[in-house]
Amino acid sequence: MSETAPAAPAAPAPAEKTPVKKKARKAAGGAKRKTSGPPVSELITKAVAASKERSGVSLAALKKALAAAGYDVEKNNSRIKLGLKSLVSKGTLVQTKGTGASGSFKLNKKAASGEAKPKAKRAGAAKAKKPAGAAKKPKKAAGTATAKKSTKKTPKKAKKPAAAAGAKKAKSPKKAKATKAKKAPKSPAKAKTVKPKAAKPKTSKPKAAKPKKTAAKKK
């Protein structure tokens, strides 16, 4: 009885240890997947851009650069090849030598500049939109300035007719004076002709006096 009793509790101990190991393995695998970092395509483009070789970067040199960056090249060899093919098909990389994933690769300057230009254009358009609103205000101010100039110009036009009217008025008195001067000598001439007419009745008065004298003689 004493021999069989201690054997029973020893059996469940190894059964408890096995699930702990499985959990630890799962956690380690999950940690590796999480710390994988950026995608392969980004790492490849960075490695190609960093190289100064004119002929391009070979696959072996690419793998070395990726390994130096901390990327597991041996496990992700197929991913590197697929990433290279996709980058070549997109136009971000240009294959200078070889075919497929093997060969040497170079950054496509046109594609890189094309990606940079739209960003620069958007930033430039955003900057240009802001001064456009500010530029509208000076236009309004310019419109008011032109209106002020037009109002200033109009009195000048009004002054010219006034000056012309003044000049005409100044000229007209001269004419009036001339007419008055011409008319003035005529009136005394008329008066001179009238005076001899008034003298004629004086000659008729002696004629009426003659009959009075004859009547006195008859008496």
Swiss-Prot record:
The modification ADP-ribosylserine is found at S150. The modification N6-methyllysine is found at K26. The modification N6-acetyllysine is found at K17, K26. Residues 36-109 form the H15 domain. One of its GO terms (cellular component) is nucleus. Belongs to the histone H1/H5 family. This is Histone H1.4. It comes from Mus musculus (Mouse). The gene is H1-4.
